């Protein structure tokens, strides 16, 4: 670079480093400088750049070409956008050559892919040839066939890109030599000339006689556009080609490429005729596509509204853009006349119709298009205009309503209170008790909190008056993690001028600036937070605390807010601003306090969730909102649901002081600060806000002080609103509180996920449908709630954006992923668009480039998308990179190419390959881990991973090699040779793993990609050790010495176990030191510093490289396998290698880490349906029971995974800082892992005293209650290695079921089979990938895949048991030297404060003096022998804890509690389980649920509590108990379990069984200090022992027993022990035949007498009616009064039966003709039989062992098992329930149904009984038709000569209806037992001449006759169990016999139910409101009715009496209203029992 006179030098960084943002001001400055008058806009930038241009701009101006053009009047100046179309349609003359190149590259990428594909298909056994040859050959043939004519829409974009790219490359290679060069070139084959430099580009078109100036960045963007378009089109073309072979091979979208190309071009043309402002119009396309998506997913109601809205927006956008343009271009040179609106609308119409056609109404296409829109380029961002937009927002007047603000504050208070109650079991301390109403004072005293459903709006107003007292501490010392986020900051006000280039600011200011700059302290000069600290030598850790306490931040003279031009969204007036370091610090602190203390009360904020958790939540939401799955609640209301996705305009700026201080004041009170949380609103209005973008300087008027400069565009004061990103968290929490008020107002349940202004809200509300359809109900709810939300926001000054607020019934659209009906629509093309921009930006670093190509294309494999598309795209670019770009690289010439050739020659020699082409194919297929021959990269890929990763890589390498050379022998030498031939360096035999101990986990799995390599680390440490700031200096020093010190401490402990060391490592200060070094080394600041200091010396590099080489050569040493055994040659090496690595990991010399073998080499994939021995089975769940939409090759499901949480004790945790909490946990972990080491206590004591200042004894009380057993287990299992093919873990969804059971022999004995999933994660992932790939390559997903281990060597390491001792001496100096990294000591005051607030601890501390209590829990329950007992009691404990949890979390995100417990239940002792369940229930009822006042009452109440439990609980429990292995085990103990067929019958069985057992002794969980974790529970339990309720206990209490882990973990552990000891053949306890049903021994005749006598009348005389008699029949019966009764009295004699009672109104045998002989009946078939009561009666009447065929329509909520039949005849052998049939084949109108009737028995079906409820006569006749068909065509039924009959239920119609041909009605039966006003009759139908069906009036006629002349009969005998069940399901507290006294006492207690102390009696359906309102009312009304009935005098059981009874009862209306219809029937059943004694 020529030395230029210092006065002129003014180098500035071009803005190209702000990728993607194109600066308007810079373009304007460049253009104005060149033409000498304003270019784009007449503003101060233009003025300055004309007056004092930058030297770089002058250079371009003075180019000869540019001068000529500017002075030539024929050339017209336009703005850059207007050249876009012309530039992007330039095809170079050698188009054919480029296309040939393209073809060649694709051809090669197909070859390379083929080499990878073959091994994959080989492993999957898919490559066996068929007619057309192998799969892989078919694929390659297919693509090569299409290659001959690559469509124009692919090749032209490639050509355009190559053209632009060549120009750029040429410029870059010139620039390397001459930094200031300006390149002038003609774009090949066009009339376009380009003058290019890094500081600006001039484009001149000789064709259209136009020219323009733009920034370098704009040019890059155009090149990237061409590239992105090529990429998108290439993938679309590939994918379409692949899909022709087999659907699912390509991507799921079916876009049409030529249309895509047309879309790009027409949009370009549209933009090129307009101006920069019109990008806003293009942005509206998104809305259009969204409206198309809604059209697909939603009903018309939802989508049309959005669609119309959107079209209006488009027109508005055009008008707005036009006005903006006219305003901007006044007086500027580049002004044009815009086309008229009509013309624009016409061209827009074309574009939109193109989009419409492209979408093809296919969601996959639309979601792809939705995201593809970045492909049209970026607008230029005008920084000044952005500031003006912000200023306008501020000046807007806001109207806030006081009521809204008050209720917002109230809701915020409510959230905090609720959070405290949930987390700390208490209210926060409050000052103003006065303002609370009595109700709230009551809540305060009981430390409880109502749920939202119980609140009203006034409650919020009441709470708004609450003030808090301080609860949280501000940390005295700054936590270093606060400091270390490397954000940008602004210079202080006095140095603000450093932002602008010198030329742009007046000389006066320049001089003054220079003077001040010299005087300023180092930290003030920097622009990044991190350096601000690094440079500060006076830095004290308590500084920040002082600033906050003294409120220095409120009037800081140096405060300025500067806006930079970096952000993309500036155009719309989003202001991203920076402030000086000091203020930034305060802001960071405020955010941190919020995050640590407050966010936990707002679970809806997304800031808390990681990606996986978020995905899990979204999956749950998708499942919940699925519209195919809508449910009704227990009151038969339809639960309407809708989703809202809202977007608020200018969310942050709309928050004024008024609207945020209502909440921030509360936070200040809680933290004891003054206005810390509203600092923003208090300081910002007083500061100047200024645009500091370098090309947009203010007009200073020579004032140095910013405050004196007049306001202007880009500089203003008195900013009122918020600022983007500064208080995000606070505002998010406010938004959540606001939604609480909305939920209360609208009375619906609302769950939301909120991130600032982006909200996804789900709303549900039970409603009565009335005449509306479900979708109308949903729509009403959506509109109503949108109105409420909109109003609520308006009240606090916010506005909802119309176009971006979507209403939907069932679509999730969060964080830009679209989900519908549970199917995920991942926009794959969007992901690879990024493959464009970096290809050149990072081209300097080929290695990084290859890595990112690999990882970005891998996105295409994600979620089971297309492997082929991914491989072909990746290989295309890799091949181009290595074979084209490397040959002449713009920065390093041929150097890299030479080294590549060197590697290829290695390979060629090593494997005798034929040519270098083949070597390149091999090289590009070697897993990227081998880093393309660069030792640096290969090291980078190894040091972050475990050796598994190594095993995997080598496996892959071998697989691929095997396909290159069939004859290659694989032995250790060849493997080593293969690895080494890829690397160029020599090896060293005596190497050790040098860096390993830095990261004991493995070779550095924790150290993410933050550090590029060790070279960088070395540099960072050396820079840091010179930093002025002491903390950074010492951390660097400590960091370098860590390794030896840690080894010193643990040298005496054996074995040296990496995971164990990790725990120790984290509890010592190194960890923090390393964290600092790590964090620093990843930041931008450090890169800047490194550049400045060039701290990396040559020796450092040599050292680091040597270290890597040594580490790598160690691999070759490890790879010396032992004795060869006879196995597949390729497996052997790897498995042995794997084993060796594993063994070595114990050897102190080389710590490597634990490993598990690679699934690819250890499993053989088998597809069969028969089960093989010893294999992992992966199978699909059956598809007909799916819940979340269909899925197949083209629709993957949403997948996810979860994490468990440790439980913490309930002390007052806010007192501790995060550091202290972590340290406590670390010490607890240490104790846990190393408990077997001799001097562990001394070590812990040392640690806790020195790091926390507490003795170990005190510290123990703060330990987490228990650590999960899994924690240790996780230590023993390796981290999961790479799967193959790489990225499919997300395929792990609900769709598959793994059974690793068959491998049990080897593994499960050691690890219960629930954990095996953890161990076998890699196998499972592998299996799932297999599934996905098979699905892609064959188009069919296999139902089952077996992974058969090739060898028995899959063995897992046990967790080590440590011996020896720690070296304590070495710990003390470490802690003393590095004290600054330790948490503060916990002071005595803090320690006391910890326990003060927690009531539980009060009692715990008092109990310390009570020695008796300490004694109580000394003894262990588990003594080594009583495994089964321990298991059974722990499982009971587990289910009770779940019961408690379900009560507490009335939330929507409930987990599936039964996961992982199936195996444990196999070994249950049922009797013991039930006894302990009963004990726990009693204890917890009393202690926690506060039921009843004394123990006797509770015991009675248990069944009631269980009856009222949410069905979800029983479903969960039934899921476990119905698993085959558990079921079989339980049947051995209790036969009656056989009758359990679904969750409701399970509930019935369980509750009944519970009543048979006594309470027993149970163990209690204690923590390390042997303190009970369920304190109240234990105390209550002791009371029970004292009162002698528990069997086998004297009053001596000293032996309450304990267990050390929580119940589930203890149970798991027992299961493991049982299996290890081979208790598989364990003798189950012999039990009596049945625990519960004594009546299973009832004789058939006894049972028959449980049915009442049936009263029927048979109609005849209707057989051949004439028309005139018909007219008479249609008239209503004369003279008969229909008895008017409101209650379903026909149920009054059915009280013996629970689930159904059809058998009480009709008898099958009575219906049959007299001549029919019972002996003809071998089998009866029942259709639509429900619970099977009629079937039971038939069996009893026919007698003998008759065979039954039972079919009932499968409906998830209804019985499809004959539960009533099984209740009374549990073990009936001859019944075919059709359990395995699908939904279709249980529907009698379907032919399939009739085909499957002879599934089990081939006897003829002489009698079929159909009791189905059939909608519509049409369907009813269809069944008759099907019956006739079957009887006349079925070969089994034709065998019999007897008559064939069908008994069928029929609802008579008003009109005469003919029976179908060949079907004759023989007899019509009308029952007294059916509904009086109904039209029900039972018909006997045979074969014969067809006749007519009875009409409604006839049936009614007969029924009334019956009702008048006959009465109901009681059954002879009673079934007390059934009766009790009926009574309890209505009123749990009541039982048989019912007496007057029982009823009156109950009535009294129900009256008291509302009083507060009994608030928690029961709960239903997780909704406390129902409980408070309905329960009380329901019980009350039913009891009143029963009381009335029991007092009645004797009467006849007929309708006259019933009518009288109803008329005399005054409260009938109340009774009917408070009870649902099904409950009403039960009420009548119970009433019937009362009548039994007093009927005549």
From Swiss-Prot:
Residues in the signal sequence: none
Compartments reported by the entry: Virion; Host cytoplasm
Enzyme Commission numbers on file: 2.7.7.48, 3.6.1.-, 2.7.7.88, 2.1.1.375
Keywords associated with the record: ATP-binding, Host cytoplasm, Hydrolase, Magnesium, Metal-binding, Methyltransferase, mRNA capping, mRNA processing, Multifunctional enzyme, Nucleotide-binding, Nucleotidyltransferase, RNA-directed RNA polymerase, S-adenosyl-L-methionine, Transferase, Viral RNA replication, Virion
Short name of any one Pfam family annotated for the protein: Methyltrans_Mon_2nd
Annotated cofactor note: For RNA-directed RNA polymerase activity. Mn(2+) can stimulate de novo initiation but it is inefficient at supporting elongation of de novo initiated RNA.
Active site: 1273 (nucleophile), 1705 (for mrna (nucleoside-2'-o-)-methyltransferase activity), 1811 (for mrna (nucleoside-2'-o-)-methyltransferase activity), 1849 (for mrna (nucleoside-2'-o-)-methyltransferase activity), 1880 (for mrna (nucleoside-2'-o-)-methyltransferase activity)
CC cofactor: Mg(2+)
Segments forming domain Mononegavirus-type SAM-dependent 2'-O-MTase: 1694-1884
Sections of the chain in a coiled coil: none
Keyword Isomerase: no
GO terms under cellular component: host cell cytoplasm; virion component
GO molecular function terms listed in the Swiss-Prot or TrEMBL record: ATP binding; GTPase activity; metal ion binding; mRNA 5'-cap (guanine-N7-)-methyltransferase activity; RNA-directed RNA polymerase activity
Catalytic activity line of the entry: RNA(n) + a ribonucleoside 5'-triphosphate = RNA(n+1) + diphosphate; GTP + H2O = GDP + phosphate + H(+); a 5'-end triphospho-adenylyl-adenylyl-cytidylyl-adenosine in mRNA + GDP + H(+) = a 5'-end (5'-triphosphoguanosine)-adenylyl-adenylyl-cytidylyl-adenosine in mRNA + diphosphate; a 5'-end (5'-triphosphoguanosine)-adenylyl-adenylyl-cytidylyl-adenosine in mRNA + 2 S-adenosyl-L-methionine = a 5'-end (N(7)-methyl 5'-triphosphoguanosine)-(2'-O-methyladenylyl)-adenylyl-cytidylyl-adenosine in mRNA + 2 S-adenosyl-L-homocysteine + H(+)
Sites where the protein binds substrate: 1728-1732
Function: Responsible for RNA synthesis (replicase and transcriptase), cap addition, and cap methylation. Also performs the polyadenylation of subgenomic mRNAs by a stuttering mechanism at a slipery stop site present at the end of viral genes. The template is composed of the viral RNA tightly encapsidated by the nucleoprotein (N). The viral polymerase binds to the genomic RNA at two different sites in the 3' leader promoter thereby initiating either genome replication or mRNA transcription.
Protein family (similarity comment): Belongs to the paramyxovirus L protein family.
Assembly: Interacts with the phosphoprotein (via C-terminus); the association of P and L forms the polymerase complex.
Domain characteristics, as noted in the entry: Contains an RNA-dependent RNA polymerase (RdRp) domain, a polyribonucleotidyl transferase (PRNTase or capping) domain and a methyltransferase (MTase) domain.
Protein name as catalogued: RNA-directed RNA polymerase L
Origin organism lineage: Viruses, Riboviria, Orthornavirae, Negarnaviricota, Haploviricotina
